[in-house]
């Protein structure tokens, strides 16, 4: 079954909702954005997450030192990196890694040392999907996440199109820029039970 990552959580209530609804991954954004949390805030929220739900730290062009500090302070299970990735960034990390790839039309998939790939829209967090026809995932060495403009109305179609390891959502479970607990529940329900579209 396709796994679910709910990203950009910053409150106790949102974390508890995502966990209770069946999220497999919880994402904390450490890169500058409206969803950014500090290491200290994430460490407190991480205490609410059971061991079978994985904690993911999201970074943009980080140094290896930044990754190691966050892994240690928050107890991250995975790091997700957007932007520039040094050749040795993922070597011998104490946790798994996800490299984000912006799907911009050239169809290029990088040769990555990361454990997972995540395919996102050209502007991450914009709520806009990329053109699914521009991405060919056949022959990929790594399992992959699909992100970029997913919501409760299109996520089942995305799963049918790509058969991904996991789907990732942030703005698609928000209302007026804040995490919407009902949207979180409905999104996860659609993924887990294959219910497509609104009635």
From Swiss-Prot:
Say which domain of life the source belongs to: Bacteria
Give the CDD domains listed for this entry. Answer: PRAI (cd00405)
Q: Which GO terms describe its molecular function?
A: phosphoribosylanthranilate isomerase activity
Q: Which UniProt keywords apply?
A: Amino-acid biosynthesis, Aromatic amino acid biosynthesis, Isomerase, Tryptophan biosynthesis
Q: What is this protein called?
A: N-(5'-phosphoribosyl)anthranilate isomerase
Q: Does the keyword Signal apply?
A: no
What Pfam families has UniProt attached to this entry?
PRAI (PF00697)
Q: What is its EC number?
A: 5.3.1.24
Entry's Gene Ontology BP terms: L-tryptophan biosynthetic process
**EC supergroup of this enzyme:** isomerase
Stored InterPro entries:
Aldolase_TIM (IPR013785), PRAI_dom (IPR001240), RibuloseP-bd_barrel (IPR011060), TrpF_fam (IPR044643)
The biological pathway it contributes to is: Amino-acid biosynthesis; L-tryptophan biosynthesis; L-tryptophan from chorismate: step 3/5
UniProt record similarity statement: Belongs to the TrpF family.
Q: Say if the entry is tagged with keyword Cell division.
A: no
Q: Spell out the reaction equation it catalyses.
A: N-(5-phospho-beta-D-ribosyl)anthranilate = 1-(2-carboxyphenylamino)-1-deoxy-D-ribulose 5-phosphate
């Amino acid at each position: 079954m396709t796994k679910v990552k709910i990203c950009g959580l910053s409150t106790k209530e949102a974390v508890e909702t995502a966990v209770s609804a069946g999220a497999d991954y919880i994402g904390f954004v450490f890169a500058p954005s409206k969803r950014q949390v500090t290491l200290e805030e994430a460490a407190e929220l991480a205490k609410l997450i059971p061991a079978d739900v994985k904690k993911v730290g999201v970074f943009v062009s980080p140094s290896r030192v930044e990754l190691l500090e966050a892994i240690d302070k928050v107890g991250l299970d995975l790091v997700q990196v957007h932007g520039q990735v040094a050749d040795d960034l993922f070597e011998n990390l104490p946790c798994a890694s996800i490299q984000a790839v912006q799907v911009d039309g050239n169809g290029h998939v990088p040769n990555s040392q990361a454990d997972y790939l995540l395919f996102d829209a050209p502007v991450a967090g914009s709520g806009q999907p990329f053109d699914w026809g521009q991405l060919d995932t056949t022959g990929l060495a790594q399992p992959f996440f699909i992100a970029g403009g997913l919501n409760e109305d299109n996520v089942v179609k995305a799963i049918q199109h790509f058969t991904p390891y996991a789907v990732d959502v942030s703005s698609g479970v928000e209302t007026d820029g804040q995490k919407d607990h009902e949207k979180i529940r409905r999104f996860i329900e659609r993924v887990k039970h294959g219910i497509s579209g609104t009635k």
